[in-house]
Amino acid sequence: MAAPSEAPERRRPFGRRFLTDPTRLFQHNAWDNVEWSEEQEATAKSKVQENSSQLLPQDKQEEYEVNAKRYWDDFYKIHENGFFKDRHWLFTEFPELAPNRNPSQNEDSLCEFSCKEVSKNEGLGSCENGHCTLENRAENQLNLLKSSPRFCTEELAPQKLKQSYEDYPGSSASYRILEVGCGAGNTVFPILQTNNDPGLFVYCCDFSTTAVDLVQSNVEYDSSRCFAFVHDLCNDQSPFPMPDESLDIVILIFVLSAILPEKMQCVINKLSRLLKPGGMILLRDYGRYDLAQLRFKKGQCLSANFYVRGDGTRVYFFTQDELDDLFTRAGLQKIQNLVDRRLQVNRGKQMTMYRVWIQCKYQKPAGPQL
């Protein structure tokens, strides 16, 4: 099959609200596709240079890596399921999550995408000292993973893992979705509510045991349609409950940014192996010079564009080219890679907040490339 055609780089707007008259700035809470001036970008670069001029000592950086799981567990113990809003806007941006849904539903739902939603990056944190709590049926993957390379190279290893799964959660499903870094279920449950395909099965995993417990204890958790499990993406001995080439969609929403940059390529390689030919990875994450990056102070920078928050969780701020390189090195083809520059407004305080997010869709080739 021929390679998929690239979607135009100029995106369909999240909403249809554009600031054409500056005098109307405080009439709404958010404005879409806001272009930055050269002066504004220069100011942002200057702030990043300033807050990254003093890096944390290496021993402190190693401490945040080793204890990453504990920091995310603590986060979910404190906030439980009350920190993030359910992401009903996802179906506007990623219709692949509910292919049969009426596209007119929630057309402007991203206006609900509040600062609170992205004030903390979602998901799994770093990947050291994590553990897996899968059912015994997934244990047969351990021996296969132990024999695979411990460290990944720049390019995706050409060989595939040979797997034999007779029965696994969702084995009879016709459409399988995996969300990585599921948190308390703010993506999973909207998918289960919106996508009524009887052949749908949704997997969701998180680095935090506490987060997975929150998903499994939710009254909407239905084990006949969903399987939640603890998973450490960066640990080669942490198994998945499904075989390679079994997934239609992998979702990464504010998750990749929480991983140590040196480990990101290995993570994307690992996830790409799970995709069926024609399957896609859907990503939304922090972009370079987002307000959250500019607000960091000296002494919070770990490495270039990688920071630690006050609670010990970490976050990276991407460029489009960096993400494109990660995905294409994993053998995936670009369908979408765009920047969403959003101007959010606090009308009460007369404040403006410039947000920068990147949204991507990358697809596994549907057949051998000739």
UniProtKB/Swiss-Prot annotation:
GO terms for molecular function: tRNA (cytidine) methyltransferase activity; tRNA (cytidine-3-)-methyltransferase activity. It holds the Pfam family Methyltransf_12. It is found in: Cytoplasm. One of its GO terms (cellular component) is cytoplasm. Its main location: cytoplasm. GO terms for biological process: tRNA methylation. It catalyses: cytidine(32) in tRNA(Thr) + S-adenosyl-L-methionine = N(3)-methylcytidine(32) in tRNA(Thr) + S-adenosyl-L-homocysteine + H(+); cytidine(32) in tRNA(Arg)(CCU) + S-adenosyl-L-methionine = N(3)-methylcytidine(32) in tRNA(Arg)(CCU) + S-adenosyl-L-homocysteine + H(+). S-adenosyl-L-methionine binds at residues 72, 76, 181, 206, 232-233, 253. Its EC number is 2.1.1.-. CDD domains: AdoMet_MTases. The keyword tRNA processing applies. The keyword Transferase applies. Keywords: Cytoplasm, Methyltransferase, S-adenosyl-L-methionine, Transferase, tRNA processing. Monomer. Belongs to the methyltransferase superfamily. METL family. S-adenosyl-L-methionine-dependent methyltransferase that mediates N(3)-methylcytidine modification of residue 32 of the tRNA anticodon loop of tRNA(Thr)(UGU) and tRNA(Arg)(CCU). N(3)-methylcytidine methylation by METTL2 requires the N6-threonylcarbamoylation of tRNA (t6A37) by the EKC/KEOPS complex as prerequisite. This is tRNA N(3)-cytidine methyltransferase METTL2. The gene is METTL2.
